[in-house]
Amino acid sequence: MHNYLDFEKPISDLEGKIIELKKLASEDESIDTTDEIGRLEVRVREAIVEIYSKLNAWQKTQVARHPQRPHFVDYAKTLFQEFTPLAGDRKFSEDAAIQAGLARFRGQPVAVIGQEKGNDTKSRLKHNFGSPRPEGYRKAIRILEMADRFGLPVISLVDTAGAYPGVGAEERGQAEAIARSTEMCLGVKVPLVSVVIGEGGSGGAIAIATGNRVYMLEHSIYSVISPEGAASILWRDSTRAREAATNMKITAEDLKSLGVIDGIISEPLGGAHRDPDSVIAATGDVIANALGEMASRSGEQLRNERRQKFLNMGRNL
């Protein structure tokens, strides 16, 4: 059962008719609805093509947040073998918003870091809706240090609206944890590939996304603040989020043209939530190619190239 976004109403109406016809045919075998269903399926595809070929920034934001969009756990199950999650920051507690550990990726030992939002009420509460606390970033630092020590490539999958802004998180050094994680990403002497698979929100995202290669899924977003947050600050009106999204340049196309990311991973027709397996496979191929390109580079080269990449970004924007 699909959760339809508001701009998907034409698709919803057509697929609703298909469901009704299938139900009618199952109740009365004398009724043949095959031809009509076939025609409607063609119209559904045409509607999806028409709508998704001209999504605006706000609509892409909605797709990036779609509740059925594949999350970190979905990628981990498919892309990684022998994934062994590590827990805790060795200072305060465990933070389930960041999942991190060791695994094999197509036979190669790697370190994995990702943000998990959860997919139902219970798991969303467990993972704090994908908004990490300081302990999550300090756990990421543990994994990065381990990867650097043992020469393991790092793969990070980004999907967060932003770091958790609660009082407790601030008291325990949220800003410092984000800064240290960013610094560690920039400093490791191993390949680091980052992919924004949904939302890339502010420092909460960049803390694990300062990679040698940074990619975005076609309908993901990456920004310093959410459109709602920007609208609240600029106009004191969060309902102007659509306007803010347009002006913030948050889409994959915008960020590729600005040189912030290295590439865009195409999504299936209608978004990643309509065919999770294919987008996960495509993401795996891109990661594998990136790691292959960097395999012959020394640790110093990898670190210097990564640092220079982000220094240039600040100079040239």
UniProtKB/Swiss-Prot annotation:
Catalytic activity: N(6)-carboxybiotinyl-L-lysyl-[protein] + acetyl-CoA = N(6)-biotinyl-L-lysyl-[protein] + malonyl-CoA
One GO BP annotation of this record: fatty acid biosynthetic process
SUPFAM superfamilies named in the record: ClpP/crotonase
Presence of the UniProt keyword Transcription in the record: no
PANTHER family: ACETYL-COENZYME A CARBOXYLASE CARBOXYL TRANSFERASE SUBUNIT ALPHA (PTHR42853), ACETYL-COENZYME A CARBOXYLASE CARBOXYL TRANSFERASE SUBUNIT ALPHA, CHLOROPLASTIC (PTHR42853:SF3)
Name recorded for this polypeptide: Acetyl-coenzyme A carboxylase carboxyl transferase subunit alpha
GO molecular function, a single term: ATP binding
Subunit composition and interactions: Acetyl-CoA carboxylase is a heterohexamer composed of biotin carboxyl carrier protein (AccB), biotin carboxylase (AccC) and two subunits each of ACCase subunit alpha (AccA) and ACCase subunit beta (AccD).
Keywords linked to the UniProt accession: ATP-binding, Cytoplasm, Fatty acid biosynthesis, Fatty acid metabolism, Lipid biosynthesis, Lipid metabolism, Nucleotide-binding, Transferase
Function: Component of the acetyl coenzyme A carboxylase (ACC) complex. First, biotin carboxylase catalyzes the carboxylation of biotin on its carrier protein (BCCP) and then the CO(2) group is transferred by the carboxyltransferase to acetyl-CoA to form malonyl-CoA.
Family designation: Belongs to the AccA family.
Domain of life of the source: Bacteria
Organism of this sequence: Rhizobium etli (strain ATCC 51251 / DSM 11541 / JCM 21823 / NBRC 15573 / CFN 42)
PROSITE patterns: COA_CT_CTER
Recorded metabolic or biological pathway in which this protein acts: Lipid metabolism; malonyl-CoA biosynthesis; malonyl-CoA from acetyl-CoA: step 1/1
Record's keyword annotation contains Nucleotide-binding: yes
Enzyme superclass (EC): transferase
Locations listed in the record: Cytoplasm
InterPro entries: Acetyl_CoA_COase_a_su, ClpP/crotonase-like_dom_sf, COA_CT_C
Disulfide bonds: none
UniProt GO cellular component terms: acetyl-CoA carboxylase complex
Ranges for domain CoA carboxyltransferase C-terminal: 40-293
EC number: 2.1.3.15
